[in-house]
A protein has these predicted regions:
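Phosphate- and other anionic-substrate recognition elements at nucleic-acid/protein interfaces
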Residues: 1-102
Length: 102
């Protein structure tokens, strides 16, 4: 008997070096079924363009494999280091692009 009944959600904790990914499936009642967790990593020494491309490819692969109904992304918050915020903002843009093309 299939216990999945609701939305499948791709959760994203955005980052350029490490981007957290998870898939959960709504089950019967108020249950949430974990499906997959992972981290998309990009090499720190690679160019910004290469890193963003790798991140885009990783996210589109997850979307293709798990076919989520919706994407939920953690909101970007300032931690005091401007360059970190800017790099994460670039990653967020690529993640939104990948999700919008699914």
């Amino acid at each position: 008997m299939d216990s999945t009944v609701g939305l499948r959600v791709l959760g994203i904790d955005p980052g350029l070096t490490r981007c957290g990914l998870s898939i959960v499936q709504a089950g019967k009642g108020r249950t949430v079924i974990p499906v997959a967790v992972g981290v998309a990593r990009t090499p720190y020494k690679s160019s910004m363009g290469d890193r963003l491309k790798e991140l885009y490819e990783a996210i589109t692969e997850w979307i293709s494999e798990y076919n989520p109904d919706v994407v939920a992304m953690e909101r970007l918050f300032e931690r005091g280091e401007v360059s970190t915020v800017l790099h994460t903002a670039h990653a967020v843009g690529v993640l939104i692009l990948a999700a919008s093309q699914a």
